[in-house]
Every structure is written in structure tokens, then in C-alpha cells.
């Protein structure tokens, strides 16, 4: 049994046979190619030479795929730094929207359409209820992030939202929530349920949905109606997971959700010729960690289920935090609350400068003598990534 294996190791061993048996779609094949070849030299190399001692340093390029476990830290730090400019020193709430598992097959068959519908339903629910004077009576700001996995890499689409605890009323004055989340969870869940199922029904009526695998039966009008009726009868779940009092705590928390993938390397416990063992949370036992073993190709299937559609935007900003509003309205909110504006530490920095700032590593200095490292232009034999496989 092998220890300390990585997701890259798992893909190298099991993906070739998985591809032969299953004929995965192009964006799954591309993701697998990226993971298997990340930092191997397949995406090119950076070569530098010390001016003083002649020491040569070769760094293999990463794949930069948003599904690669080795490529998330740098984008995450850059994104968090950019968000600091729009974080107020006010309460924030982490609200989660989930859908019943009966919808999983039809959502998976129509990922782009029905993931978008999740964002539409969650955002319109928050906007509508926040503007109601019964709850807050203000325009709010929030960020929505789609996750499609549970701890065991099972299919579990849900939306995480980071909601600003306050907003601007009709007179453009700041209205505070009083330190508590301002919307009843039962009301959120009911409104979200109605909006999502209404959009699902509209897409079915307009013949815009596809039906694959276990979702094929929903092509039939009566089966689809039964599905809707069943989902309307169920109590949907929306809940506030965390509350943050102040800007710094929410900033530190954001990165846990923004650039997360279905599973990270540290959860892979072992791999054999036929199986993979990884750590999962057992929510039926107070969230205790336990080990789960699956066939290698099943691990690949589970991982690839969570590759988003091509060019799909997972992190979306709404209300006061939307692109068209945040420059003016967030400045106004900052002035009302007396908050100082954060000056980005990473904006317009080169990659080498960011590495030094984030990790205190100076890649421009020789590790042997401390001399200056200068780029060495690659010759025609240096490997480069194929154009059709670039991110």
C-alpha cells in the first residue's frame, strides 16, 4: 500500500482506464490532462541562471486549472486581496441554500442552466426579502459561490452566500441589522423553493432541458409534474452557518470557500492497484472524520462530477457588491460607517513580487550564493503546452 499519494497520482494510475470505459466529455478530459501534467514540464518551464555562480534553476509551470489541487493557493490569495477593498467593518453572515436530492439527476443533466437557476433563485430571494420593510427595508450586498459536492464527493449542489449585515435604505442611509441575521430561515427556504421550481418548470415548458441517465423519465409530463409536486411538499433547507463581527474575520473565512475544489491532497490517505482511500466527514456522527475506500475509477468519476461547465463563473457578486455598484455605493457605505479603504498589496504586482510578499521567498536570488537570478530564454527543445490544451 502506498502512502502520501496525491490526486495527481490517482489520476495517473486510474484515469487512462476510466477514459477508455466511459468516453468523458471534453472539459473532463481537459481537466484530467491538466491535473496529470501540472508541474511536470508539459506546460513549459522557467529557467533562470545566477549571474555570479552560474547556478541554473528550473521551475516547471503549473497548469492553472481551477480544478487542480496544486493551483488554487495563488489565485485564492489574489482574489482575497482584491475583495478587501470592498469589505466593510460590519457584521457578515454565511448563508447556505440547498436543494432536495430528488433534483440531482435533472440538475446534473443541465448543469449550466440549472446552476444559473440556483444563483437566480438565491439572489432574488435575498434581494426581495431584504427590501421588505418587515425584515430590513434596504439594498444589501453579498457574494454567491456554487459548490456541488458533499464530503464524500457525492453530488450535492448548493450555494454559499456571504451576506453583508446591513444596507442602504431608500434615502441612501445605512441601515444596520442589529447584530443578528435579519431574515427567518423558514421564509428564506420557502421563497427560494418557489423561485427555483418556477424557473425549472419554465425551462421544461420551453423545451430547454436535456434528460440523461436516471433523469430520462422526466421527459414525460406526468413524471415531471410528480417531481415538482414532491419537491413543493418538501421542506427545503436554508441556514446561517457562521456570523462574523468585523472585516478581518470574514476576509480570513472567504478563502475557505472561494477556491475550494471537491477534495484536497491532504485527504487522500492511501492508494492500491485498485482502490483509493480518503477521509470524509460523517455528519451522522457529529461530523467525525472517517476513511472511505472506493475503486480507483469510481474516485475519478466522483471527482470529475464536480468540474464546472466551460467558462462557468462560480463566484458572483450582487447588490452593493456587484461590479456596477461597488465603486460608488460601497464608497458611500464606507463613508457612512467611517471605514478606512484597504489599499491592495498585490494589485499590479508581478508574479515574483507576489511570491515574495505572500511566502517571503525571493525567486530572483540564487539559493546557493545569493546572487541575482536572470531569466534564460528557452530554446526550441523546451517543451510547451499544446494550444488546444491551454486553460
Predicted regions mapped to residue ranges:
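Beta->alpha loop/short-helix hinge microenvironment recognizer with preference
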Residues: 1-391
Amino acid at each position: 500500500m502506498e502512502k502520501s499519494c496525491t490526486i495527481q497520482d490517482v489520476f495517473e494510475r486510474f484515469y487512462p482506464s476510466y477514459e477508455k470505459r466511459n468516453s468523458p466529455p471534453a472539459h473532463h478530459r481537459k481537466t484530467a490532462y491538466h491535473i496529470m501534467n501540472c508541474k511536470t514540464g508539459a506546460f513549459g518551464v522557467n529557467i533562470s541562471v545566477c549571474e555570479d555562480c552560474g547556478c541554473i534553476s528550473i521551475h516547471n509551470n503549473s497548469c492553472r486549472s481551477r480544478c487542480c489541487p496544486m493551483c488554487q493557493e495563488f489565485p485564492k490569495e489574489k482574489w482575497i486581496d482584491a475583495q478587501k477593498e470592498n469589505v466593510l467593518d460590519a457584521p457578515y453572515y454565511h448563508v447556505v441554500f440547498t436543494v432536495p436530492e430528488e433534483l440531482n439527476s435533472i440538475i446534473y443533466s443541465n448543469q449550466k442552466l440549472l446552476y444559473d437557476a440556483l444563483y437566480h433563485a438565491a439572489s432574488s430571494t435575498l434581494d426581495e426579502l431584504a427590501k421588505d420593510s418587515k425584515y430590513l427595508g434596504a439594498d444589501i450586498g453579498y457574494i454567491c459561490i456554487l459548490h456541488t459536492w458533499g464530503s464524500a464527493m457525492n453530488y450535492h449542489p448548493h450555494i454559499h452566500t456571504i451576506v453583508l449585515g446591513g444596507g442602504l435604505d431608500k434615502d441612501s442611509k445605512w441601515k444596520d441589522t442589529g447584530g443578528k441575521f435579519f431574515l427567518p430561515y423558514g421564509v428564506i427556504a420557502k421563497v427560494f423553493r418557489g423561485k427555483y421550481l418556477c424557473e425549472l418548470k419554465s425551462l421544461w415548458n420551453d423545451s430547454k432541458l436535456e434528460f440523461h441517465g436516471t433523469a430520462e423519465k422526466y421527459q414525460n409530463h406526468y413524471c415531471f409534474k410528480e417531481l415538482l409536486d414532491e419537491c413543493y411538499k418538501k421542506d427545503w433547507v436554508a441556514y446561517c452557518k457562521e456570523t462574523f463581527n468585523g472585516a478581518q474575520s470574514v476576509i480570513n473565512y472567504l478563502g475557505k470557500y472561494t477556491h475550494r475544489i471537491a477534495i484536497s491532497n491532504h485527504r487522500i490517505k492511501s492508494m492500491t492497484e485498485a482502490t483509493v482511500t480518503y477521509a470524509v466527514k460523517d455528519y451522522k456522527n457529529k461530523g467525525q472524520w472517517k476513511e472511505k475506500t472506493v475503486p480507483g475509477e469510481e474516485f475519478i468519476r466522483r471527482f470529475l462530477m464536480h468540474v464546472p461547465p466551460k467558462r462557468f463563473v462560480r463566484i458572483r457578486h450582487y447588490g452593493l457588491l456587484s461590479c456596477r455598484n461597488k465603486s460608488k455605493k460601497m464608497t458611500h457605505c464606507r463613508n457612512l460607517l467611517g471605514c478606512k479603504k484597504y489599499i491592495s498589496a498585490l494589485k499590479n504586482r508581478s508574479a515574483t513580487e507576489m511570491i515574495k510578499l505572500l511566502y517571503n521567498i525571493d525567486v530572483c536570488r540564487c539559493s546557493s550564493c545569493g546572487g541575482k537570478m536572470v531569466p534564460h530564454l528557452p530554446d526550441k527543445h523546451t517543451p510547451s503546452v499544446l494550444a488546444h490544451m491551454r486553460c
